[in-house]
Structures are given as C-alpha cells and as structure tokens.
C-alpha cells in the first residue's frame, strides 16, 4: 500500500511512476477522497468541540438556575453529538473507500526499471552456461522414454482433473532430491533460516502480501474462509505482520519448501502439455525482511542465491530485469531467471526475485525500531523462488536426456539419490 502523505506531496511523481506500468493517473481520485475524508474529520472535531463547550455552559446555566438557557444548551449538546457521530461515520466510510482504492494500486517501479509493455520489453542483464549441443533431436520432459513411467498425467486427471501430475519411482525421487538440495544450499551456504509454515492462511495474510483484494480469482479459498497459499512468500513475509521488531534482528532471511496452489486463471491454452504449469506444485521460497537502506543490496544477494542453484545443477540460464509493464503487483524491481529447456528450444522462467520496498509492510503494519532511536519505520521486504521444484525437475530431465531415453543426473544430486547417477530408459534410478 502507498503512503498517502507522499501522494499529497508529489502527485505528479506518483502518477509518472504508475505510467511506467502503463497505467493512467490515479492521484486525482485518491486526493479527492482524501480531501473529503479530512474535511469530515475536521468538521467532526469542530462539532465535538462545540458539543464540549455547550455541555460546560449548560452545567453553568444549571448551577445559576437559568432553566431556559439550560434547556437550550442541552438541545444544542444533543444536536452537536448527533452531528459529530454523523461526520465520524462519513469519515470512516471515506477512509474505508480510500483504503480500498490504495490497496488496488500496484507498487511504484524503482528508478532504472526499463519501460515497456510486456515480456518482449524485458532486458537481459547476464547469462550463464552454454546450451548443450545434442546429436539427436531433444525431447520435451514428458516425451523422454525414461521419464514416462514416472510422470503419470492420466491417473492425475482421473484423480483431480487437468493440470495435475502423479510422480512415481525414480522421477519422484529426483523431485524430492531437488527440494532437499535447494534447502541444504540455502541454509548451509546462504545463511537462510529454514521455516515450515501452514499452507492455509487467513484473508488478512493474503492482503498483506498483495494477493488480495485484487487477485482472489488466482487462488483457492476453502468454505471456512482460509486460502491455500500460492507461494510461501505469503506465510514467510507475514511472520512480521503487525509487529514492531528491533533493528538488530534485521535482516531476517528465511527459506521454506511448501506445496503451492494456483488456479491459473487467464492461462487457458498455455502450457497444457507436461507439468510446466500446474494447479498444485512445490517451491522453495526465499524471503528477506530488512531495513530501508539495505533493500537494493539484499535484492542482488537474493538473486545470486537463486542463480547458485542453477549453476550447481549445471543448468544454463539467463537473468533478466522485468520492464514496468511486466512486473508483478507488489514489486518495485524484479529479476527473472529463465532456464534453458532444450525440448522447447527456449528459455523459460524458473524464478522471480522481487524487491517490494515498504509496499507490503504498510499493508501489514510491520515496522522496526531504528538502531539510533527515533520513530519506528516500515520494514522492507523481498521474495524470490529458490527454485520452483517442478520446473527445475523439467530442466534437469531435458538437459540431461540421452539418445537412449535415459537421463544423466547432476552430480550434486547423487548424494541425495543414494549414489545413483542416472535415470534409466526404464524409469529406474541406477
């Protein structure tokens, strides 16, 4: 959410930043509501003061036996009391309307975010690794002979419908190994604190990180009102919801491996084959809670943590910075990591690493005490995939596939597979 004071002070700059997202100006509507709300508050305070004055004068009139004046003042007290209540109710309604409007406005891009409308305008900033030269036509993951026995879409469709998968045997073991490897790397080498949290959360938590109220259709809600998390960003970031933390406790760097659930609204017809786009999937998510000065540096650090996973696995990738028109709702700047998928012959997103500034913190009312004292300030938040486990599995299978239908597995996974190094053409680890 945005700071209304900053919008009052420089509405032109606010609208100019939104223009980088290709959005029309909204400051006139915001400031009009704000002015109406403030005028009601001022009028309510004036009416309350008149009520207090009349009440005091009524007491004096009663004391000197002036019954007529007492009755007049008592009626005035009642009228001002009713007026105060009416104005306060109007101010409360306007405040709710203003908050609703502010909650629907996305975060402002950082200076330097490239302008653009969509993914075609994103800017590559680096790449790592050379795509492998195959001496045969590489297949997509679900076409590889050794993968087919362990990737069962037919049974999944019987159980749950489209965009689900049942993993079996060696493929399931590799999937599990990837998640364990990612957690070990992030906790033991990158210094992130492993966290396990619920996958069902309250609406306030989804609002805190920006999924609600605008993007409710993208997630699943239970009859009881809980939401299934679309990412552990929701739970990890909201661990400081409503808190006032000490500066010395920052940065807080967390990582979680969880199930994630997305309705994929608006994705009809996209990636319908294979397990690239699923309603239920696993992800290792990184979140940092930091102060106002460290956010940009922390963003670079988190990006490197995600890149390290791909490098250890030997997977070619490129890092891009998203243009204003392609950034997510809560981000000020986003780095996407795209891994090379030889079966598709192109790079596909496998991680998004975003710096959100104090945007989420204002929604959560999450603050910290500055080390030198002074007024509490809002924390700054960051989140990033480290990585999406299913998509990493796809990349490992496609990049490691062999002409005979087997898959050569990355060396860093061997200890997690009991020393096994390959997925055979029969789907058995060997």
Curated annotation (Swiss-Prot):
The keyword Calcium does not apply. L-serine binds at residues 231-233, 285, 385. ATP binds at residues 262-264, 349-352. Residues 47-66 are annotated as: Disordered. Pathway: Aminoacyl-tRNA biosynthesis; selenocysteinyl-tRNA(Sec) biosynthesis; L-seryl-tRNA(Sec) from L-serine and tRNA(Sec): step 1/1. This is Serine--tRNA ligase. GO terms for molecular function: ATP binding; serine-tRNA ligase activity. Its EC number is 6.1.1.11.
